[in-house]
Amino acid sequence: MKFDKSQLLIYAVTDRAWTGKMSLYEQTEAALKGGATMVQLREKGLRDDNVEEYLEEAKKMRALTEKYNVPLLIDDNIKLAKACGADGVHVGQNDMDAGLARQLLGPDKILGVTAKTVEQALKAQSQGADYLGSGAVFGTSTKKDARPMTMEQLQAICASVRSR
């Protein structure tokens, strides 16, 4: 799938802890119907516990996102991304070096990288990141280790990579 950055408007990140009575599939489809333009499968509980279940979930999500012509990214797992036919991966600063991720993915897959500083953003961009994930700007209960950044920090990150 060709990645058009201008089409990235709403980025849905999965977390089965928040699905309530809906299945992960149902919740993801609701997000797609609501206008999500990219989906990241980020299921921390399935990663190491049950690789086969995670692969099956990833294949279901791949079929669903294809139905809506929306890219699917896998959080931190290039092997799983390749196995399910995902459009790319998102890696955090403590997961895998962005340059290595780009090398393993190849030039035609989407690479997202978490960047919480200008230095991290510039490094990720130079190593082939297609987009950056920055934040949280506000406190959140969805990511326990997230420390809010100021709007000034976010603006500095955006300004540092915007013209490159």
Description of each model-found segment:
Residues 1-88, 95-96, 103-130, 146-149, ...:
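Conserved N-terminal beta1-alpha1 strand-loop-helix module at the mouth
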Residues 96-99, 141:
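A short, polar/charged loop-to-alpha-helix boundary motif
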